[in-house]
């Protein structure tokens, strides 16, 4: 079901060279993913460049990398993942495993890239589909494309968290750039954090020169989007239907003109840096908190 998969109770894999895999999915059970860990304590470290390509036909649920349970995966070189042909496919997919003894979800941890590297996720469906787990992307360039760029879903009675963190200049190009969700119970959340900290600091005058760009809609009835550190971030597209929390903690964030360009339903907390917008407009559910 998978190109490479770890399923034992304890499995460690270390690859010092390049990892280059290409697969074609011809049926629903042909490939669950190109590379995966689904066990209690599996670890994988790839120090060289990683290139994964999967071609499939709709409606197969194709995945480039998949991780569940207590999986721990690190990719230290350039990372390129392409999953094409499936609207429900994912370049990167994570999910929790329910532990009956603790009555809580066990979530995987994945890191892609390091300083100076490039991370590219390209999918006909989801760039990142995080339904439980911690995902971090680091590099001098991070690009995500798909029908949905980043999907995060946490919470519920299983105490599941779903977090995605970008430590590098990031571009998300997708009709649905960011979608956040929390299951029933809302005990633990879902978050997307832009944390690029450039040296030297780039202080853009216009949104076109921002370090990171989100090109597409931002939606979700819950969840959190964080802007941290000194980098800059620009939103393009409709963000008016995001009803979660946006935390402006550092750097500069640019919004767009018109009602679609504002977090009109969200709760905004500005505790550092600058939030740049032509005007601010809130609906009944909107709220603005300023510090300082």
Label each PLM-derived region with a short phrase.
Residues 48, 61, 88, 106, ...:
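Cysteine-rich, disulfide-stabilized extracellular repeat modules
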